[in-house]
């Protein structure tokens, strides 16, 4: 059941998220991704850096590499880290394209609210369980399914 955002699997990722917010955004991109990778490994995940993704024949998806993919059994997490204030659109596209169980988009120097607004404009976000995190603010929020269900529940 990969890619279905299984809520009962939160126990596998919540402790990791609380450690991830302590990563240092002042380091270079590769050094911060290395910190993130070590955190996943401490929690028993197997990791792959610069995980390749390929463009589909119809050209609807993008080719590139995802900063980090962590796996524990059949549970898969995709992580994209952007050093800037806002998470790039292509980062959202890439992590959603591989249909992970959990996607984590991290902005090194941004504010959580502006990154949440940006993520909510990306309709494909509902394809997996998505967390947005900012290292400067030391905060993370779940976007889907919890946040979208709450925000669409009001008339």
Q: What is the role of each PLM region?
A:
Residues 3-62, 71:
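Acidic-basic catalytic patches of nuclease active cores, encompassing PD-(D/E)XK
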Residues 76-133:
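Catalytic cores of nucleic-acid endonucleases
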Residues 32, 64, 87-91:
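Amphipathic coiled-coil/heptad-repeat helices and related helical stalk/stem segments
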